[in-house]
A protein has these predicted regions:
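Membrane-embedded, hydrophobic transmembrane alpha-helices
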Residues: 1-143, 566-578, 582
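Membrane-interfacial loop-to-transmembrane alpha-helix junctions, especially the N-terminal start
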Residues: 22-32, 74-92, 143-149, 257-264, ...
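Transmembrane signal-anchor helices characteristic of membrane glycosylation enzymes that use polyprenol
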Residues: 28-46, 144-173, 240-244, 269-272, ...
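Transmembrane alpha-helical segments of multipass membrane enzymes and assembly factors
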Residues: 65-82, 101-105, 131-133, 237-238, ...
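Active-site lumenal/periplasmic loops and adjacent helix-entry segments of GT-C-fold
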Residues: 153-296, 300-301
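Transmembrane helical bundles and short interhelical boundary loops of multi-pass, membrane-embedded
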Residues: 293, 325, 349, 354, ...
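Membrane-interface alpha helices of multi-pass inner-membrane proteins
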Residues: 321-337
Length: 590
């Protein structure tokens, strides 16, 4: 029955729908709905209609079209239009940064809006490039894939709307979150020529990973739209949508299952840990942040780069696409300094494992490792500053920002402790270590959906695939650095946030490997969503009682928090057991 709704494997032969037939209409309808919804939501966000038209044209003609042509020339067509356009948009964002850098270095920002023209002309005039205007070797995806991706993108759009609906466009009375104003100042500065200065301090050189702000500045200069409108409204959803398409393509490539794409796209960016009413949240629940454009923007080049590195470790030739590796590495380093180190660690682990197993130097992997290492070093010299300059080693420092520790043992630690461990742990003795262990265990448990993919390392067949080690090593490195480093503003959490999509792709791959019927996978997801709604107390008569805090921030005790953490973990384990039983029951009947 599942086969009637969705093809199981992406490489299975599928009848190509007629370009004007019912299949084509049904496949295109969800994309029309997504675009219409996006325009509607933008308009409800007080964006004028002329700005909507200009920004839409900018994305189509200055990013998607030239990027798709270049990506097809370097990597080939993916056999279907949506994925081609998604990968093309990601490549277009890369090309835009290069064009912006050239314009800023030469003071020719007025010519920036024309950068796509030479690309489009070249692909129209050169005979052997003209074939990249169309999808080659068509491998159409099932109608259900299109509707699944449409649903995922609509959820992304809804998330974007919830982020900006309470943030009015200027001029207004009131204040903005300080990070938003900081990025707005950077966007204004990046419309000027190099060398850049810190917009808040005259004469101070700008040291920051600012390439996300360069994208927003480019969009403003090319369209003529106010930087505030682009930053506060327009840039976010298209970039997240592009990242969602990349995650979907990566999941489909790795698993060979068509359904893995929409599942990964939705879970990677909108999925959050289900804490089931616990007063202790899971720091770093989502990879997206409205207040941190750098974190959200970097997911696009990071996922595009991850796809290339997967081919490298699997021994596939990149051919003309090899230059993308160092360039994307530098873009990642310049967009968010925490994005590249976990991927480098995962690549290093993969190289060591397969050198040990085969006693052969994996030269392509070492070349890629050298490229990324050089990109990170250059990025540190060109961009690093701000938070990167205040990061230091302190194991378990994340505890400073989690209530059970910060309200008890951590009250006397201060904002910038210099000890190798939070002082409260040692001062608390055995009880201090027990509390630290309980908090870390709860964090790992709450992040469980991002860990499931690690099970592939126990699968003898999959363990031989270098891609498993690459993704698993990347996720582990992101978690480890989050708990090893300390930052006064909890910026170490970005190491984890950056690898969440990687962990979800790995989890989706493992679920596809299990070959469970799709309803068995839907049941736990629906159960998690309902549990989240119920424990939030938003459904009258259905809300599950929330777990109470053990007193106020000044009166809570270690023993009280240990009871709360134990109850939270018990509730979570029971929930997983019930959801698993339901999934097994559905699978048995399907």
């Amino acid at each position: 029955m599942a086969d009637l709704l969705l093809a199981e494997r992406s490489d299975a032969p599928a009848p190509a729908p007629g370009r004007n037939g019912p299949g084509s209409v049904l496949s295109g309808l969800p994309w029309v709905l997504v675009i219409a919804a996006l325009l509607l939501v933008w308009s409800r966000g007080s964006v004028p209609a002329p700005d909507l038209a200009r920004f839409s044209a900018y994305w189509v003609f200055a990013l998607v079209f030239p990027g798709t042509l270049v990506h097809r020339a370097l990597r080939g067509s993916r056999g279907n239009l949506p994925e081609d356009l998604g990968y093309g948009a990601a490549t277009g964002l890369l090309l835009e940064i290069i064009a912006w850098a050239l314009a800023a270095a030469t003071g020719q920002q007025s010519l920036l809006r024309w950068w796509p023209l030479p690309v489009l002309v070249a692909f129209a005039a050169v005979p052997r490039l003209r074939r990249h205007w169309r999808v080659e070797e068509r491998r159409p995806l099932p109608v259900a894939w299109h509707w699944g991706m449409g649903a995922a993108l609509l959820v992304v759009l809804a998330w974007g709307y919830t982020q900006w609906r309470m943030v009015p466009l200027p001029p207004v009375y009131g204040g903005y979150y300080q990070d938003v104003l900081y990025h707005l100042g950077l966007v204004q500065e990046l419309t000027r020529a190099m060398p850049f200065e810190l917009p808040h301090v005259a004469g101070e050189a700008l040291r920051y990973h600012y390439l996300s702000d360069a994208h927003i500045a480019s969009g403003s200069m090319i369209t003529g739209i106010s930087p505030a409108v682009v930053l506060l409204r327009l840039w976010l959803v298209p970039v997240v949508g592009t990242a969602a398409l990349l995650a979907a393509g990566l999941a489909r490539d790795l698993s060979g299952s068509v359904w893995a794409g929409p599942v990964a796209a939705l879970a990677a960016f909108i999925g959050a840990g289900v804490t089931l009413g616990s007063p202790v949240g899971a720091s770093g629940e989502m990879p997206l942040s409205y207040a941190s454009p750098s974190q959200t923007y970097v997911l696009v080049p990071l996922l595009l780069l991850a796809g290339l590195i997967i081919d490298v470790v699997r021994g596939r030739s990149l051919g003309r696409a090899w230059p993308l590796v160092p360039v994307l590495g530098l873009i990642c380093a310049g967009a968010k300094s925490s994005a590249l180190p976990p991927l480098i660690a995962g690549l290093g682990l993969t190289a060591v494992v397969f050198w040990w197993r085969k006693r052969q130097v994996p030269r392509p992997a070492l070349v890629a490792l050298a490229c990324l290492g050089a990109a990170m070093a250059l990025g540190f010299r060109l961009f690093a500053g701000g938070g990167a300059g205040t990061l230091r080693v302190q194991a378990l420092a994340l505890l400073h920002f989690i209530a059970p520790y910060s309200e008890t043992l951590g009250t006397g630690d201060g904002i910038w402790p210099s000890a190798p461990l939070p002082p409260g742990i040692n001062d608390g003795g055995l009880v201090g270590w027990l509390l630290a262990f309980a908090v870390v265990a709860w964090w790992v448990l709450a992040q469980a959906p991002r860990w499931v993919g690690m099970s592939l390392l126990a699968d003898g067949g999959q363990r031989a695939d270098p891609a498993v080690w690459l993704l698993a090593g990347t996720v582990l490195a992101g978690a480890a650095t989050t708990w090893v480093f300390q930052h006064p503003s909890i910026s170490q959490i970005y190491f984890w946030m950056g690898v969440i999509p990687v962990g979800v792709v790995l989890t989706t791959w493992s679920l596809a490997r299990a070959r469970a019927p799709w309803p068995a996978l839907v049941v736990p997801a629906v159960a998690g969503a309902l549990a989240g709604i119920a424990t939030a107390g938003t459904v009258v008569g259905f809300a599950v009682p929330r777990i109470s805090r053990p007193g106020t921030p000044t009166t809570s005790t270690i023993e009280g928090w240990l009871r709360v953490l134990g109850l939270s973990a018990t509730r979570y384990v029971l929930f997983v057991a019930v959801a698993a039983a339901l999934a097994v029951g559905v699978a048995a009947r399907w």
